[in-house]
């Protein structure tokens, strides 16, 4: 790496883009070198690289610069946590934007900004509608990151598309003391009341149940609740997993035991659900090696930063603050605090098959609905069907972003 002369490595000047140094590959290499220096306790090299990064990656620059700035903040946070005295020697500590707490209306609009979540909503809802046709009771366990934002559209579809809407719709959600974005500014009790009232306007009777349960123990209390109160006659149990299972620890508890992630899926299979929908981001963030994890994250999180250039400034700030939170969690945290442990589509498919689930092909009408939705968004968004594993994949400029899969017990 070319040496950079630093007059005072402990004082960071205001960011100024350096000519010829703004390309993503250069920034990625600097970030990787910085991560290595931090974990090697090389304070001098850490200071040097942080200084360069600060100069080429202003937090209000282009998408690549903003992405790099987010990783810079994460590396600073990791460096300070490893060496607390370091904070007193660095005069510039860039602050991330505060995470916004959404109203229900704001969150619904926020989710609609990109297909990131809408893609999974549409694919999952279509599969659910097909699976529950003819059942008198539909019980949906919604393990979703988006606070039930998928459910109103599903209720609408049940009321309008099914030959005979179910006399009773039961919705179960988990409420935990553990939090990760997006945040909402109302309680789940209030949210449930709104959903029940909305279902009533569509002539559907709905029950809303909150189960205190946490990802950190594999949602054990939720599974216990479902075992205690099994499905009644002609009741379809649906488990909708939308970007939530990533938080269940994937590391084995002991050298001879399975991970909580594996245990959860096997216990879920024992409940014999009618259908399980699994929507996740297609990236591996589980490596114990920081450099490998950072490289994987950098080559994935450029996508959400690249998609926000057409957003209004406030929307972009909210959106990128959430991505920055993820980046900091992936880079700066370890152990139980590092909760962003997403796995690739391939690994999730292996897990589901090991738990004795079989994949179901997404119907053509769902594919058509996804295509119609994508036409409402920027031209970079696309979709591909993977015939070998029966999945749908959301893409940005040809790169895999989110996958949608549908599963039944075998």
UniProtKB/Swiss-Prot annotation:
Region Leucine repeat II (LRII), residue ranges: 190-227
Annotated segments matching region Leucine repeat I (LRI): 25-88
Keyword Cell membrane in annotation: no
Principal subcellular localisation of the protein: nucleus
Localisation: Nucleus
SAW: annotated segments: 332-408
Region described as PFYRE: spans on this chain: 237-329
Region VHIID, annotated ranges: 107-188
Alphabetized InterPro entries for the sequence: TF_GRAS
Motif range (VHIID): 138-142
Record field: transmembrane: none
PANTHER family, sorted: OSJNBA0084A10.13 PROTEIN-RELATED
Record-given protein name: Scarecrow-like protein 32
């Amino acid at each position: 790496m070319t040496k950079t002369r630093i007059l005072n490595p402990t004082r960071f000047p205001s960011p100024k883009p350096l000519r010829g140094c703004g390309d993503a590959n250069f920034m990625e290499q600097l970030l990787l070198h910085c991560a290595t220096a931090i974990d090697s306790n090389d304070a001098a090299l850490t200071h040097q690289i942080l200084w360069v990064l600060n100069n080429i990656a202003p937090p209000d620059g282009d998408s690549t610069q903003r992405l790099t700035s987010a990783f810079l903040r994460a590396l600073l946070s990791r460096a300070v946590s490893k060496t607390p005295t370091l904070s007193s020697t660095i005069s510039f500590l860039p602050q991330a934007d505060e995470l916004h707490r959404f109203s229900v209306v704001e969150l619904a609009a926020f989710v609609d900004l990109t297909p990131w979540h809408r893609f999974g909503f549409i694919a999952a809802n279509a599969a659910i509608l097909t699976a529950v046709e003819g059942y008198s009771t539909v019980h949906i366990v919604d393990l979703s990151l988006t606070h039930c934002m998928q459910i109103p559209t599903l209720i609408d579809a049940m009321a309008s598309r099914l030959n005979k809407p179910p006399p009773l719709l039961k919705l179960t959600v988990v409420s935990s003391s553990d939090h990760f974005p997006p945040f909402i500014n109302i309680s789940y009790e209030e949210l449930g009341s709104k959903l029940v009232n909305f279902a009533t306007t569509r002539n559907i009777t709905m029950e809303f149940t909150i189960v205190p349960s946490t990802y950190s123990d594999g949602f054990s209390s939720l599974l216990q609740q479902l075992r205690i109160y099994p499905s009644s006659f002609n009741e379809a149990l649906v488990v909708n997993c939308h970007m939530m299972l990533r938080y269940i620890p994937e590391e084995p508890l002991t050298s001879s035991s399975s991970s909580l992630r594996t245990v959860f899926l096997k216990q879920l299979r024992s409940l014999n659900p009618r259908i399980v929908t699994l929507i996740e981001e297609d990236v591996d963030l589980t490596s114990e090696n920081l450099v490998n994890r950072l490289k994987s994250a950098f080559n994935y999180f450029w996508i959400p930063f690249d998609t926000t250039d057409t957003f209004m400034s406030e929307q972009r700030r909210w959106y990128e603050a959430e991505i920055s939170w993820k980046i900091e969690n992936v880079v700066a945290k370890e152990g139980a605090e590092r909760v962003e442990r997403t796995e690739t589509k391939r690994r999730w498919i292996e897990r589901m098959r090991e738990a004795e689930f079989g994949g179901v092909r997404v119907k053509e009408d769902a594919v058509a609905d996804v295509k119609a939705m994508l036409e409402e968004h920027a031209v970079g968004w696309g979709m591909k069907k993977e015939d070998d594993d029966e999945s749908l994949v959301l893409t940005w400029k040809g790169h895999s972003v989110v996958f949608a899969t549908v599963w039944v017990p075998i």
